[in-house]
A protein has these predicted regions:
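Feature for soluble, non-membrane regions of globular proteins
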Residues: 1-150
Length: 150
């Protein structure tokens, strides 16, 4: 019997470049660990938890056979890990094929908020360096304050 999926499954997207394309800045081995290890692990982890949720909904798991708070924490962790790695891959480019200062509206907004791109880089780097252990720093637009935040 084929069971209908209640939730769309996450997929590991292809890298937008070859694994060695970021050398000498990021080695092929590090890209491989992050892509085939971490990123793939987040996708598989999210999908395994979605399968568990489907079993709960279908009544295949009884009370006491699952921890809904743990499942929600796991989904949050794995889905965020997947989405952040997807952003990570798309935010980088091989040498000579990207990077540098942004242009257009983003450049204008950074200039307005930070005074200069160099000042933005300093603030962003400070935010990244202040994280305990390992973690992510991302630039995002806060619609409530109409400012960029990291």
């Amino acid at each position: 019997m084929v069971t209908k999926l209640l939730f769309k499954r996450y997929e590991l997207p292809p890298l937008p470049y070859n694994m060695d394309a970021l050398e000498p800045y990021i080695s092929k081995e590090i890209v491989d660990v992050h892509y085939n290890g971490h990123h793939k692990g987040y996708v598989n982890g999210a999908n395994a938890l979605l399968e568990r949720v489907e079993k709960i909904i279908r009544g295949e798991l009884g009370a006491g056979q699952y921890d809904i708070q743990g499942i929600l924490r796991g989904l949050t962790f794995n889905i965020n890990g997947h989405k952040l790695h997807d952003l990570y891959w798309r935010s980088m480019a091989p040498a000579g094929k990207g990077g540098g200062k942004p242009g257009g509206l983003l450049a204008d907004l950074i200039e307005k908020q930070y005074g200069s791109f160099d000042r933005f880089k300093a603030v962003f780097t400070e935010a990244a360096n202040s994280l305990p252990g390992t973690g992510w720093t991302a630039l995002y637009y806060d619609t409530e304050t109409a400012t960029y935040r990291s």
